């Protein structure tokens, strides 16, 4: 069984097809999200509405290990509740211990008791790993270097119509060196089919030297 809180596996996971196929095979999937995501209807048995993080208090721990608590910008819409409150009620209904918190601050203090500005146990130390990189043999095949556009990165910005109209939300393309385009028999502005595992996409070719 899986409980998904604020995640859309078909868009957020490294291997979306593998993730969604695993969810389809699960005995139970509960998806908690502010949005009725069409893909979730294919694998989720239960959809529970929760408030987005902008309408809830909570705490983030960033990559530096810095603790960042925040308040909701506005109150949740209608009877919507923050995710932590929905989890608390589920715990109460199942008769589980440790689900009696009255605020997100109580949750934070229990998870990180006595924490100051930084979370304990987080650092950038490299342990038990060699610091010498092994040089790999040259390969004749191409290596894909991809990025996630800034306005594709989470459920909130993906649904912001104004942000999707910006230059940073342009449709992804395949950018190759002019020599590579010629060697592959492609043309600038033409289409090329890109595959990854069982997934594929038809993308426009651009030159990038």
Enumerate the language-model features and the residues they cover.
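Nucleotide-sugar-dependent glycosyltransferase catalytic core
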Residues: 101
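A cross-kingdom feature strongest in bacterial/archaeal respiratory oxidoreductases
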Residues: 1-79, 86-89, 93-97, 105-209
């Amino acid at each position: 069984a899986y409980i998904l809180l604020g995640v859309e596996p078909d868009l957020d996971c490294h291997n979306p097809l593998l993730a969604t196929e695993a969810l389809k095979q699960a005995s139970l999937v509960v998806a908690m999200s502010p949005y009725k995501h069409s893909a979730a209807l294919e694998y989720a048995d239960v959809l529970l509405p929760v408030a987005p993080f902008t309408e809830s208090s909570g705490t983030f721990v960033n990559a530096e290990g810095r603790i960042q608590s925040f308040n909701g910008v506005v109150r949740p819409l209608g009877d919507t509740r923050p995710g932590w409150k929905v989890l608390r009620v589920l715990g109460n209904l199942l008769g589980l211990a440790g689900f009696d918190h009255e605020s997100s601050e109580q949750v934070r203090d229990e998870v990180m008791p006595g924490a100051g500005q930084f979370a304990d146990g987080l650092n950038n130390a490299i342990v038990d790993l060699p610091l010498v990189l092994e040089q790999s043999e040259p390969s004749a095949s191409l290596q894909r270097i991809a990025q996630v556009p800034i306005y594709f990165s989470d459920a909130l910005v993906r649904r912001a119509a104004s942000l999707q109209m910006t230059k940073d939300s342009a449709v992804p393309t395949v950018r190759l060196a002019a020599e590579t385009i010629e060697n592959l028999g492609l043309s600038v502005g033409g289409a090329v089919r890109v595959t990854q595992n069982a997934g594929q996409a038809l993308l426009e070719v651009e030159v990038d030297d």
